[in-house]
Amino acid sequence: MVTCLTTFAVLLLTAAVASAAEAAAPGGESYVKAIFAVGAMIGAGIAIGVGAVGAGLGIGTAASGACQAVGRNPGVQGKIMMTMLVGMAMAESIAIYALVVSLVLIFANPYTKFFFVG
């Protein structure tokens, strides 16, 4: 999941450059729209990238701790596994929230009305 989200972040940054080239036409307002679109897409890429890194660190820490605990006391493997899976789900939720924020920034940006009147 983390690799998929990191790939998505790279694609968002690539799409920002393509959108800027497509939207840039002679005229002042089109440049403002292009800069706004590029800023939103770069922000979305950064959000998903940081969210994926945070999730990766959280999942790695949870798995490391669980492996050490099972190595020390193999009798409680079931309880440790359940706790580890809950912790991994919470860590992965950060990446999912970052994905939602990036999709909102790209497709349903609430700040568009402040920059474009008319």
From Swiss-Prot:
It is found in: Cell inner membrane. One of its GO terms (cellular component) is plasma membrane. Its main location: membrane. GO terms for molecular function: lipid binding; proton-transporting ATP synthase activity, rotational mechanism. InterPro entries: ATP_synth_csu_bac/chlpt, ATP_synth_F0_csu, ATP_synth_F0_csu_DDCD_BS, ATP_synth_F0_csu_sf, ATPase_proteolipid_c-like_dom, F/V-ATP_Csub_sf. Gene3D superfamilies: F1F0 ATP synthase subunit C. F(1)F(0) ATP synthase produces ATP from ADP in the presence of a proton or sodium gradient. F-type ATPases consist of two structural domains, F(1) containing the extramembraneous catalytic core and F(0) containing the membrane proton channel, linked together by a central stalk and a peripheral stalk. During catalysis, ATP synthesis in the catalytic domain of F(1) is coupled via a rotary mechanism of the central stalk subunits to proton translocation. Belongs to the ATPase C chain family. NCBIfam families: ATP_synt_c. The chain crosses the membrane at residues 34-54, 88-108. This is ATP synthase subunit c. The record marks E92 as: Reversibly protonated during proton transport. The keyword Transport applies. The keyword Ion transport applies. F-type ATPases have 2 components, F(1) - the catalytic core - and F(0) - the membrane proton channel. F(1) has five subunits: alpha(3), beta(3), gamma(1), delta(1), epsilon(1). F(0) has three main subunits: a(1), b(2) and c(10-14). The alpha and beta chains form an alternating ring which encloses part of the gamma chain. F(1) is attached to F(0) by a central stalk formed by the gamma and epsilon chains, while a peripheral stalk is formed by the delta and b chains. It is a multi-pass membrane protein. Coiled coil: none annotated. Keywords: ATP synthesis, Cell inner membrane, Cell membrane, CF(0), Hydrogen ion transport, Ion transport, Lipid-binding, Membrane, Transmembrane, Transmembrane helix, Transport.
